[in-house]
Amino acid sequence: MILPGALHISLVQAMVVPNVQVGAQNLSSHPAGAFTGEVAAEHLRDYGINWALIGHSQRRLLFGETQETCAEKVKLARA
């Protein structure tokens, strides 16, 4: 599995061999909508992305993400 930055997902998808999956480094804790700069789970699915890294220590430390935030992301990812 490769988890490129959001801007490079489609480029990496075009380069990987069939048995390598591409995922996202992050996804929004909000549904698709007017959340500037956020990448919604729904939008990732539109690009064939079925995996996202949720709960990474950097997101928790630098952005203050909590268990509740992570739970919301999981809920949206599974929807």
Language-model segments: residues:
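Active-site loop-to-helix "anion-binding N-cap" substructures in soluble metabolic enzymes
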Residues: M1-A79
